[in-house]
Amino acid sequence: MNITIISVGKIKEKYLSDAINEYSKRISRYSKLDIIEVADEKTPESPSDVEKSKILEKEAERILKHLKKDSFVITLEILGKEVTSESLAKKINDLSISGKSDITFIIGGSLGLSKNISEISDFKLSFSKMTFPHQLMRVILLEQIYRSFRIINGEPYHK
């Protein structure tokens, strides 16, 4: 299994970097993991709809450069489907069993993801109806991927 996380924006806070490194190390027991950061666009304080659209398209271009053709794409979106940890584990396991060895998770920037990226998504995932900082979402996603592998392998995990 190969898992790629494409995320818009750089992690600046050490505590988030530490958590990302820890979960990356834990996941490496189960899967190859690549984390790709693409640059985010500077967003004005009160961007117009046109400015938002241009920003999202520029970020989408950067994301698409790193997307593998045969990868199963899971986008993190507010309007995506909310699932349990067990359901996410089942999804990952089912993909592996069906021969999909590459999964790419995409995390947008502060404005989310462009329509173009959303349209190529094989599965739209939401962690909550609440909004989280995209940097923190990377940690939350990694924890859930790690938890998924623990569940798949019948190993204990915190409930």
UniProtKB/Swiss-Prot annotation:
CDD domains: RlmH-like. One of its GO terms (cellular component) is cytoplasm. Keywords: Cytoplasm, Methyltransferase, rRNA processing, S-adenosyl-L-methionine, Transferase. It catalyses: pseudouridine(1915) in 23S rRNA + S-adenosyl-L-methionine = N(3)-methylpseudouridine(1915) in 23S rRNA + S-adenosyl-L-homocysteine + H(+). InterPro entries: Alpha/beta_knot_MTases, RlmH-like, tRNA_m1G_MTases_N. It is an enzyme of class 2 (transferase). Transmembrane segments: none annotated. Gene3D superfamilies: 3.40.1280.10. S-adenosyl-L-methionine binds at L76, G108, F127, S128, K129, M130, T131, F132. One of its GO terms (molecular function) is rRNA (pseudouridine-N3-)-methyltransferase activity. It is found in: Cytoplasm. Its EC number is 2.1.1.177. Belongs to the RNA methyltransferase RlmH family. Specifically methylates the pseudouridine at position 1915 (m3Psi1915) in 23S rRNA. HAMAP family: 23SrRNA_methyltr_H (MF_00658). This is Putative ribosomal RNA large subunit methyltransferase H. It comes from Methanococcus maripaludis (strain C5 / ATCC BAA-1333). The lineage of its organism: Archaea, Methanobacteriati, Methanobacteriota, Methanomada group, Methanococci.
